[in-house]
Amino acid sequence: MEKFVCDVCGYIYDPVVGDPDNGVAPGTKFKDIPDTWVCPLCKLDKTHFSKVE
């Protein structure tokens, strides 16, 4: 699965792990995360993330 990085703070969203502390279950693809989700470190929305190449 593809990882995504926050362009501002460097947080990496790993779909294998998810973000269970913020309601995103392990195995959730980035595109399937609700638009209301924000980066757990800097609190910016999904538009500030880029795919890790």
Swiss-Prot record:
Name of a matching Pfam family: Rubredoxin
Domain Rubredoxin-like, first and last residues per copy: 1-53
GO terms of molecular function: electron transfer activity; iron ion binding
Gene Ontology biological-process annotations: alkane catabolic process
Family statement drawn from the similarity comment of this UniProt entry: Belongs to the rubredoxin family.
UniProt function note: Rubredoxin is a small nonheme, iron protein lacking acid-labile sulfide. Its single Fe, chelated to 4 Cys, functions as an electron acceptor and may also stabilize the conformation of the molecule.
Protein name in the entry: Rubredoxin-1
Organism annotation: Clostridium perfringens (strain 13 / Type A)
